[in-house]
Amino acid sequence: MSVCTLLISCAILAAPTLGSLQERRLYEDLMRNYNNLERPVANHSEPVTVHLKVALQQIIDVDEKNQVVYVNAWLDYTWNDYNLVWDKAEYGNITDVRFPAGKIWKPDVLLYNSVDTNFDSTYQTNMIVYSTGLVHWVPPGIFKISCKIDIQWFPFDEQKCFFKFGSWTYDGYKLDLQPATGGFDISEYISNGEWALPLTTVERNEKFYDCCPEPYPDVHFYLHMRRRTLYYGFNLIMPCILTTLMTLLGFTLPPDAGEKITLQITVLLSICFFLSIVSEMSPPTSEAVPLLGIFFTCCMIVVTASTVFTVYVLNLHYRTPETHDMGPWTRNLLLYWIPWILRMKRPGHNLTYASLPSLFSTKPNRHSESLIRNIKDNEHSLSRANSFDADCRLNQYIMTQSVSNGLTSLGSIPSTMISSNGTTTDVSQQATLLILHRIYHELKIVTKRMIEGDKEEQACNNWKFAAMVVDRLCLYVFTIFIIVSTIGIFWSAPYLVA
């Protein structure tokens, strides 16, 4: 029993040894007289056909400012080496072996548009060689490729970047580089949070140079990337729209509140801050202005214009008759036509189309005419009493003497007196008229001051109403402009949601 156990144990231990010997013998036979500088073709006039496939793993980052794309990918090379063919039955049914990179011939295919400091950023893995002579090599790598970033529609932009692979020293007659079937493999692709990948394409090109008649083939693997807009819409666009809409609140704020200018300047500074963020994201190029930058610039123009109009509104609101006269054109436009168009109602004024004055009329309005007519009527009615002024002035001396002599009552005044035209006049009547004249004179002064005060107050109210009209007009105009410009700018984008 012990002898049988010993024989079985020896057989088990000897099996892997024989297998290892077969593999060693295979390596020795394959490497005998093998030169890794020799192209693996039986006829030197034939090209080595190399098939290349890219297995995309992840888009790590897109640096718009430096126009560099960071990608994690595996390169899949296959070609046939006629020097590495064996009969697997002679070598213990070994179907494949591994060789380190550099041990056997490999194509000098490089990434032309690499911006890595080492240029070739692949990890040199082992090559798998099959008994049929097929060589399979899959070097992974983190690639940094240059890509021209088109920021015209940022953040609703689509970028088309590519890998350009080609032989560095072999022309097309010595190395024929071809894209493999299913040239761009995205079965293991990890989705990126910022970029969607709706399409990948492969294209083979042949380029001829003036120095050489041979073609130089290359293979382009294109990445059609579309930016996801949720982040920018939620963190930049919506806050900017809401901030811009706050400028409309400035036109509804009363001028006496004293915060109209403060609000507009605060909004302007906020828009400038958002614009600085966009400028930091965008590459320093003058070829195009990003769509988001156009939107922010438009918002900044709106806020700047609203600040200017706010200053103008405050200037109108605090004008007085001592400093400014309202011209007829300004009066007709701001007090009648625009309020009628905007359906603004002023207490005590009923505006209809029939009552509107001509826009360029220089005649005073009806309210001014009635006010002037009332003043003239009052002066005319009071001037009738002035007919007695001459007689009163003729007899003023007598009245003064009578008062100085102690004649304190009308009964002590002479009953008759000769007037300037030689007629006899009742002295008591003259004294009464004199007192009434003095009362009239004082009332005239008071009335004049009241009328002047009313006119000044009316003029100030006109300026304040004109400021209110400009405020309301700006509210409507800026609201329409903000809505139309926002829709127009974003409607021109190739897409809104990725």
Swiss-Prot record:
<dbReference type="GO" id="GO:0004888">
    <property type="term" value="F:transmembrane signaling receptor activity"/>
</dbReference>
<keyword id="KW-0732">Signal</keyword>
<feature type="glycosylation site" description="N-linked (GlcNAc...) asparagine">
    <location>
        <position position="93"/>
    </location>
</feature>
<keyword id="KW-0813">Transport</keyword>
<keyword id="KW-0406">Ion transport</keyword>
<dbReference type="GO" id="GO:0042995">
    <property type="term" value="C:cell projection"/>
</dbReference>
<feature type="signal peptide">
    <location>
        <begin position="1"/>
        <end position="19"/>
    </location>
</feature>
<dbReference type="InterPro" id="IPR002394">
    <property type="entry name" value="Nicotinic_acetylcholine_rcpt"/>
</dbReference>
<keyword id="KW-1133">Transmembrane helix</keyword>
<comment type="similarity">
    <text>Belongs to the ligand-gated ion channel (TC 1.A.9) family. Acetylcholine receptor (TC 1.A.9.1) subfamily.</text>
</comment>
<dbReference type="GO" id="GO:0034220">
    <property type="term" value="P:monoatomic ion transmembrane transport"/>
</dbReference>
<keyword id="KW-1071">Ligand-gated ion channel</keyword>
<dbReference type="GO" id="GO:0022848">
    <property type="term" value="F:acetylcholine-gated monoatomic cation-selective channel activity"/>
</dbReference>
<feature type="topological domain" description="Extracellular">
    <location>
        <begin position="20"/>
        <end position="230"/>
    </location>
</feature>
<feature type="disulfide bond">
    <location>
        <begin position="147"/>
        <end position="161"/>
    </location>
</feature>
<dbReference type="InterPro" id="IPR038050">
    <property type="entry name" value="Neuro_actylchol_rec"/>
</dbReference>
<dbReference type="GO" id="GO:0045211">
    <property type="term" value="C:postsynaptic membrane"/>
</dbReference>
<keyword id="KW-0812">Transmembrane</keyword>
<comment type="function">
    <text>After binding acetylcholine, the AChR responds by an extensive change in conformation that affects all subunits and leads to opening of an ion-conducting channel across the plasma membrane. A subunit of the levamisole-insensitive nicotinic receptor.</text>
</comment>
<keyword id="KW-0325">Glycoprotein</keyword>
<dbReference type="InterPro" id="IPR006029">
    <property type="entry name" value="Neurotrans-gated_channel_TM"/>
</dbReference>
<dbReference type="GO" id="GO:0045202">
    <property type="term" value="C:synapse"/>
</dbReference>
<dbReference type="InterPro" id="IPR006201">
    <property type="entry name" value="Neur_channel"/>
</dbReference>
<dbReference type="GO" id="GO:0005231">
    <property type="term" value="F:excitatory extracellular ligand-gated monoatomic ion channel activity"/>
</dbReference>
<dbReference type="GO" id="GO:0007268">
    <property type="term" value="P:chemical synaptic transmission"/>
</dbReference>
<feature type="glycosylation site" description="N-linked (GlcNAc...) asparagine">
    <location>
        <position position="43"/>
    </location>
</feature>
<feature type="disulfide bond" description="Associated with receptor activation">
    <location>
        <begin position="211"/>
        <end position="212"/>
    </location>
</feature>
<keyword id="KW-0770">Synapse</keyword>
<protein>
    <recommendedName>
        <fullName>Acetylcholine receptor subunit alpha-type acr-16</fullName>
    </recommendedName>
</protein>
<keyword id="KW-0407">Ion channel</keyword>
<feature type="transmembrane region" description="Helical">
    <location>
        <begin position="473"/>
        <end position="493"/>
    </location>
</feature>
<dbReference type="InterPro" id="IPR036719">
    <property type="entry name" value="Neuro-gated_channel_TM_sf"/>
</dbReference>
<keyword id="KW-1015">Disulfide bond</keyword>
<dbReference type="InterPro" id="IPR018000">
    <property type="entry name" value="Neurotransmitter_ion_chnl_CS"/>
</dbReference>
<feature type="topological domain" description="Cytoplasmic">
    <location>
        <begin position="315"/>
        <end position="472"/>
    </location>
</feature>
<dbReference type="Pfam" id="PF02932">
    <property type="entry name" value="Neur_chan_memb"/>
</dbReference>
<keyword id="KW-0675">Receptor</keyword>
<keyword id="KW-1003">Cell membrane</keyword>
<dbReference type="GO" id="GO:1904315">
    <property type="term" value="F:transmitter-gated monoatomic ion channel activity involved in regulation of postsynaptic membrane potential"/>
</dbReference>
<feature type="transmembrane region" description="Helical">
    <location>
        <begin position="261"/>
        <end position="279"/>
    </location>
</feature>
<dbReference type="GO" id="GO:0005886">
    <property type="term" value="C:plasma membrane"/>
</dbReference>
<keyword id="KW-0472">Membrane</keyword>
